[in-house]
Amino acid sequence: MKKRGRKSKKPEEKRAEYDPSSILPLELKIEILMKSPPKSIAKLGFVSNHWSSIIRGQVFTDLYMRRSLAHPRLLFSVYRPNMQMQFFHSCSQEDPSSDHRSVSYTLNSDLRYSFSPPIGGLIFGQNNTKAMIGNPSTGQFVPLPRIKTQRKHIFSIFGYDPVNDLYKVLCMTVRTLRGPHYFRWEDPMWEEPMTEEHQVFTLGPKQKWRMLECKYLHRHHSGSQGICRDGVMYYLASFNDKRSLMSFDLSSEEFNVTKLPEDYILQQFGNMVDHSGKIAIVSQAYSGPMDLWVLEDVSKEEWSKVAAIVPSITDIVGNDQRVIFRGILSTGEIILSLLPTPKPPFFFLCYDPKEKTARKVVIQGIGEDYAAINVFFDHVESHMVLSKLT
């Protein structure tokens, strides 16, 4: 009788036999991962299927995200033209002097990405029809398929759909009778007929840009970034010759329009922020009074006005400096920065409307040869490993 030969073990099974960590209890493994930096966690996910299953598992993912949400970070996108490089720098939002981390990537000589505010630890970058998704915490950046358009004026928003647990990018392109150029509210072209292409990309393997239909003929306000909250994207636009707030539901992929307050004066660069869990628009101001219009009820188109008086900060920035609104932290503090970007070291101003105090926050580690800096607030670290999306 012929003896049946032993089935040879797979390389993965052999590695598991010699992996000392295989005898550790799951709770201890998770504890080790929680104390590891995001880059190390991402690399460990490629060591074995066992570690990968833990890292990608719901238990560890929920624990890691819960901790990240409790400790938000400041994220800076820095451009260095002499080195043809953009890099991200982050630090603790609670104590900007501590826990500094940087990750860089080299660009083509003619390419510089503009980044949308990060969502769930991921960030979207675009340069004309080229686009990418990145995880600044792990240093992984993945190119997306080129945006399908022949037009030059492109506006994109990055968001997360909590209903279906999906990340999506909304892209809009514009054509006007006079050709694309930066808009001004007083420009007559704002009232001329226009057409728009609307495309959406869902993050995942083998995905493509999909064309969408929008029943509202509008043009977005190019002077303001969009914002995503609770699975809905918001951006400023013109609809029926009126300044409006457009919204896009990431789950149903449907557009809607909301009227802006009649007495709201929208300047060239309107800012959209999350104010105490609600969408708000900020009147651009270089100093003095600052008005926030808060959307209290979307269905009823009800807005409330919140006035914030920013005190004189001459002693901090000097007489010849202008300050510009940058955002509102989850704590309610108002962030201001200088125009133009200050010389090294980079700093911004943090104003507490409750205490009526302003302070200068200096950020170390960015270097001295930067040309442009974008600041993102309430950034959360993510250990997510991005799949190939092209």
Curated annotation (Swiss-Prot):
Signal peptide coordinates: none
Pathway(s) where this gene product acts: Protein modification; protein ubiquitination
Regions that span the bilayer: none
Domain F-box per the UniProt entry, residue ranges: 18-67
Ranges for the Kelch repeats: 115-161, 272-323
GO biological process: protein ubiquitination
Annotated localization: Nucleus
A single GO cellular-component term on record: nucleus
Keywords: Kelch repeat, Nucleus, Repeat, Ubl conjugation pathway
Entries under Pfam families matching the protein: F-box, FBA_3
Oligomeric form and interacting partners: Part of a SCF (ASK-cullin-F-box) protein ligase complex. Interacts with SKP1A/ASK1, SKP1B/ASK2, ASK11 and ASK13.
Listed name of the protein: F-box/kelch-repeat protein At3g04660
Organism expressing this protein natively: Arabidopsis thaliana (Mouse-ear cress)
